[in-house]
Amino acid sequence: MKTPEHNKTTMELKESDFQKISRLVHEQCGINLHDGKKELVKARLSKRLREGNFASFSDYYRHVTTDEGQDELVMMIDSLSTNLTYFFREFGHFKTLRSVLPEMAAARNGDRKGARLQIWSAACSSGEEPYSLAITLREVLGNKPVPVSILATDISTRVLDTAIRGIYPRERMKDVSDQILKTYFRYGSGKWTGFYQVKKEIRDMVRFLRFNLMDLPPADFASDVIFCRNVMIYFDKPTQEMLVNRLYRILNKDGYCFVGHSESLTGLAHPFNYVEPSVYRK
């Protein structure tokens, strides 16, 4: 174990330790930490080493691969996950969703009357995406009698805590219209001045859950719409292909799958039908 003096220095991340950590992260959550990510790993994990009183990255790796270190393994994945997002990110996707929701709602009131409209935000980060989905549903469907369920999952417990609270600083709201802000958010006062909280009626539409995309989704994840955006860019091709085919299996017939604009299913073996760039249908 390290001595207090180590808090004042930056520990060396040896290539052998970086490779071990990279393999572990890939096995656990599919993230591909190539050689260009070495400094990022060093920077983000150094704090964990200092707080955990570890003398080296080797000691830290040994700990997170033991039964006693499983909680710290979760914290390590949290630290290495990239969670940058904002409300209505890639707005074209929400425009497409608005155009197909009436058809989906009609199906619930026709042949599938009473069936629940299920949407899965598969890498929800700090909650902006699923809340954007909930607002879109409310805007398009209003109070129509269509049961709706939004499942929001992420591997990071840290961002899920933020998502559940639904409180965001003013700068995260810069692309949200005044009408949306007034209708679906509460502006803070006192110590919360400069913050907005998603109103309870919208928060109640979303169920948050920690889930690793490398695991098999349970049957109750079956969805009509899946948003799995800006996460596959961190995976290698075999992992991307595995994930895309899992998403296909969990998607209901005629359902839609949205991926990030910087992502593509080109070159991957999959059964999806192409709709438009970054939008696919089963």
What are these regions (language model features)?
Residues 97, 226, 251:
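Residue-level signal for inorganic ion chemistry
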Residues 225, 266-282:
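Core SAM-dependent methyltransferase catalytic element
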Residues 143-227, 231-242, 264-266:
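Extended basic-aromatic, gly/pro-enriched interface segments that bind polyanionic ligands
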Residues 114-127, 132, 149-151:
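Conserved class I S-adenosyl-L-methionine
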Residues 98, 134-138, 248:
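A structural alpha-helix within SAM-dependent methyltransferase catalytic domains
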